Amino acid sequence: MELTINTEKETADILDAFIKVAPYLNSLVQDDITIGIYDTEKLLVNIPAKTFSLNVKAGDPLQEGDIITDAIRSNQKKTSMVPKELFGFPLIARAIPLHDENGRVIGGVGLGTSLEESSKLHDVAESLSAVVEQTAAAISDISESINGFSTQMSGISSQAKKVSESAGEIADISVTVKGISDQSNLLGLNAAIEAARAGESGKGFSVVADEIRKLATHSKENVGQIDQITKKIHSLLKGLEESIESINQHTDGQAAAVEQISATMQEISGSAQHLAKMAEKALEEE
């Protein structure tokens, strides 16, 4: 009889010690926790968390399937994730059996920790990671477009140089034609002089000489117009080349800036993924 009394007193003392300490535990940890102290039949005391309650009260009997009941019945530490559908937020529950000096199970302690903030952090990290990946993909597309545009501009510049070379060839031909025109005009003039000397017999030749001079004059005028057009083409091509060069410089600058942004986005993406993994790990370890 005395042994039974001592055992009951020891059990009461152990449970009472936990009951006295329980209210202080929430202040000792960073997480927001709720604590329940149980004997082998019922809840003795519940210390609610700062931001949530499990809607239990002292005297509530142990429920089959509850983590604390499993811990007490199996004499083992138990951990379980409680989905947010049950209480409106995710929760991790832990339970351990309590023993007397002889190792007999006399009750248990249940601990509930809200994972709401960790879950939010995980969701934000995953969302950030997704946004960063989308942004990085968009930047990659922009970079490809810039590189493609730069290639096209290089092609245009090359074609413009070829046109400029062709215009130069036209100018050279114009010089030659002008020389021929001047020579033809001189020959026409000499022929007209000789026709005049020939008198009546040279009239027919005089008409031909006049036509040669008219043709030479007309050719010279055309050559002058061609020369003006060629110079204008040269001027336009020079302006085009300068514009292309300016565009290429800006494009190179933009490409470099995009590469820098892309590198930065990759770093951010890596950090976001690391943050998501840390948040997920925190959820698993809570």
Curated annotation (Swiss-Prot):
Q: Which PROSITE patterns does this one have?
A: CHEMOTAXIS_TRANSDUC_2
Q: Where is the signal peptide?
A: none
- SUPFAM superfamilies, per database record: Methyl-accepting chemotaxis protein (MCP) signaling domain (SSF58104), Sensory domain-like (SSF103190)
Query: InterPro entries of this UniProt entry?
Result: MCPsignal_dom, Sensor-like_sf
Please name the GO terms of the biological process aspect recorded for this protein, alphabetically: signal transduction
All copies of domain Methyl-accepting transducer, residue ranges: 68-286
Look up the domain of life of the source: Bacteria
Q: Which UniProt keywords apply?
A: Transducer
Q: State the Pfam families in the record.
A: MCPsignal (PF00015)
Output a single Gene Ontology CC term carried by this record: membrane
- Induced by what? Transcriptionally regulated by SigD; part of the yfmT/yfmS operon.
Similarity comment: family membership:
Belongs to the methyl-accepting chemotaxis (MCP) protein family.
Briefly, what is this protein's role?
A: Chemotactic-signal transducers respond to changes in the concentration of attractants and repellents in the environment, transduce a signal from the outside to the inside of the cell, and facilitate sensory adaptation through the variation of the level of methylation. Attractants increase the level of methylation while repellents decrease the level of methylation.
Recorded protein name is Putative sensory transducer protein YfmS
Q: Which lineage is the organism of this entry classified under, starting from the top rank?
A: Bacteria, Bacillati, Bacillota, Bacilli, Bacillales
